[in-house]
Amino acid sequence: MNLVPMVVDQTPRGERAYDIFSRLLKERVVFLTGPIEDGMASLIVAQLLFLEAENPDKDIFMYINSPGGVVTAGLSIYDTMQYIKPSVSTVCVGQAASAASLILASGAEGKRFALPHSRVMVHQPSGGVRGQATDMEIHVKEILQLKRMINEIYQKHTGETIKKIETLLERDTFLSPEEAKKVGIIDDIITQRKENSGKQE
């Protein structure tokens, strides 16, 4: 059983208790953790849309610790990040693998980060198909189309050539933060907050 810590806020109307994730959502912090599937993706999309409605001009901060998951679920998060007006800053804590690495790379330019001991893994989409030969052929075509689409997304956000991206994604490729920065998946490695980062403007 997962226990979610509660925090108490002091307000003019008295004390109010929040679970820790809801409290951080008030500060425009979104957590993308665990396997990426449709239910989880819907929760992330809903939070992004809510924060845009709250303030379309203020950045959103997404902390990522995920092994990846369903490609289409990951793409729904990606498309929403590109669709909304606020910039989304992405931070890898722990790991960003598969679809999660694509989301990490698609953060706002100059605002994509990783902590020093995090790991990034990229690869091409995969799928197990069984059934009639014709159905298998249809699914193979779809996977190849997804592969081209994902390569183009990485190319757009990293600035690398399609040929370099294809080579990088051909097999499971594990990257240190330094290597992820070199290929353009992140912009910088962060070890500590800036001294004034917690102060109100």
UniProtKB/Swiss-Prot annotation:
GO terms under biological process: protein quality control for misfolded or incompletely synthesized proteins
One Pfam family hit: CLP_protease
Entry's localization field: Cytoplasm
Root EC class: hydrolase
Keyword hit for Protease: yes
Coiled-coil ranges per UniProt: none
Transmembrane annotation, as ranges: none
Keywords, in A-Z order: Cytoplasm, Hydrolase, Protease, Serine protease
Top-level taxon of the source organism: Bacteria
Entry annotation: catalytic residues: S98 (nucleophile), H123
Entries under PROSITE patterns matching the protein: CLP_PROTEASE_HIS, CLP_PROTEASE_SER
Chief location bin: cytoplasm
Keyword field contains Lipoprotein: no
Record's catalysed reaction(s): Hydrolysis of proteins to small peptides in the presence of ATP and magnesium. alpha-casein is the usual test substrate. In the absence of ATP, only oligopeptides shorter than five residues are hydrolyzed (such as succinyl-Leu-Tyr-|-NHMec, and Leu-Tyr-Leu-|-Tyr-Trp, in which cleavage of the -Tyr-|-Leu- and -Tyr-|-Trp bonds also occurs)
EC number: 3.4.21.92
Gene Ontology molecular function terms on file: ATP-dependent peptidase activity; ATPase binding; serine-type endopeptidase activity
GO cellular component assignments: cytoplasm; endopeptidase Clp complex
Family under the similarity heading: Belongs to the peptidase S14 family.
Subunit comment: Fourteen ClpP subunits assemble into 2 heptameric rings which stack back to back to give a disk-like structure with a central cavity, resembling the structure of eukaryotic proteasomes.
Role played: Cleaves peptides in various proteins in a process that requires ATP hydrolysis. Has a chymotrypsin-like activity. Plays a major role in the degradation of misfolded proteins.
UniProt protein name: ATP-dependent Clp protease proteolytic subunit
This protein's encoding gene: clpP
